[in-house]
Structure formats: C-alpha cells, structure tokens
C-alpha cells in the first residue's frame, strides 16, 4: 500500500497517550495513528450503513413475531 505523508497538530497529552498505547500494542506512533484513523473510518461507515439498512429490515417487528411464535409454541 502506498503511504502518504501528512502533518497534523496534536495536543501533547493526546500524543503522550498515543505513544503509550502504541508501545503497549507493539506499534510505532505512525502505525497507531493510522490504525486509529482506519478504525474511525470503519466506525463511521458502519454507523451510516446501519442507519440506512436497520430501519428497512424492521428488526423490531421481526423480533416481536419470533417472540409471539415462541410463546404460542409454548417455548
């Protein structure tokens, strides 16, 4: 994968926490920040996906039907 250089300004306390977390995970600072950015991207993508698909699935109605079927069957 091609890497791009970026420049960011980060609070010193945040940077110290990132460095400690990176050491604990066996990563360097750049790897830790890249991982954090990737995780945030995936979190946002999942949030957007579920905001669009979950209502369409009407999972609450499905759960209610399953619950009622189980009660009717004596489960």
Swiss-Prot record:
GO terms for biological process: positive regulation of growth; regulation of DNA-templated transcription. Transmembrane segments: none annotated. It comes from the Bacteria. Keywords: Toxin-antitoxin system. Pfam families: RHH_1. InterPro entries: CopG. The keyword Transferase does not apply. Antitoxin component of a type II toxin-antitoxin (TA) system. Upon expression in M.smegmatis neutralizes the effect of cognate toxin Rv0299. This is Antitoxin Rv0298.
């Amino acid at each position: 994968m091609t890497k791009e250089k970026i420049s960011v300004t980060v609070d010193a306390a945040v940077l110290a926490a990132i460095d400690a977390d990176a050491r604990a995970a066996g990563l360097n600072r750049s790897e830790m920040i890249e991982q954090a950015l990737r995780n945030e991207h995936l979190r946002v993508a999942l949030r957007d996906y579920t905001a669009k698909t979950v209502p369409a699935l009407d999972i609450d109605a499905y759960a209610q039907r399953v619950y009622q079927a189980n009660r009717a069957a004596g489960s």
